[in-house]
């Protein structure tokens, strides 16, 4: 999307950048395949507390518009020195989404394997390891005695942690490590399961649509401790 910066400011405490994209019949890069006029606005706010991100879609068409949000977020590993083996990732996953040979959901959910159960408890090494490309439902995990919705990467040797916190609109995850031999892994929060508009059961897939003039927003936080 060719976003344009619509607002930017800097203070002693934070930096904010707002960017927007409008899709309509006169700007048909997306409209020709998705014939709904809409506005997408993303706000980034950076401070000593971390990075906050908010994305909002507004339906500017005359019909209900399907809307699903997902972010392809790479987390650098290692990020604070050490070796890949020092780091584990935890993610608030519930069940595993069964995928077909095209990596599309079959509609079935599976219990977490022994490998992926480590995402909930203890952590899983996700770089310098085997390929991972898997989908999951969202279910909160316990972090420091509190329920947590999101992903985190921890250096087990130093205790340094990076948190990627999501809101309650995130209902699914895709986790991808690009073959396992690169210095990053992507915990990708999604408001609906991959291919949700074509799912047999839209309700459990997270599919949603918004009426003309309505908006749909999601918020995320990225910070270190």
Name each model-derived stretch.
Residues 1-48:
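Extended, loop-rich substrate-binding clefts of extracytoplasmic carbohydrate-active enzymes
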Residues 6-17, 45-50, 83, 156-157, ...:
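A short, structured loop/turn motif at beta-sheet edges
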Residues 55, 208-224:
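Short Pro-Gly-centered flexible turn/kink motifs
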Residues 55-61, 177-178, 224:
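Asparagine-centered strand-capping/turn motif at beta-strand->loop junctions
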Residues 68-76:
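Histidine-centered catalytic micro-motifs
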Residues 77, 81-167:
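Active-site/ligand-binding surface loops and adjacent short beta/alpha elements
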Residues 154-194:
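Glycine-rich active-site loops that engage anionic ligands at enzyme catalytic sites
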Residues 186-187, 192-209:
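A conserved acidic, glycine/proline-rich C-terminal tail/linker
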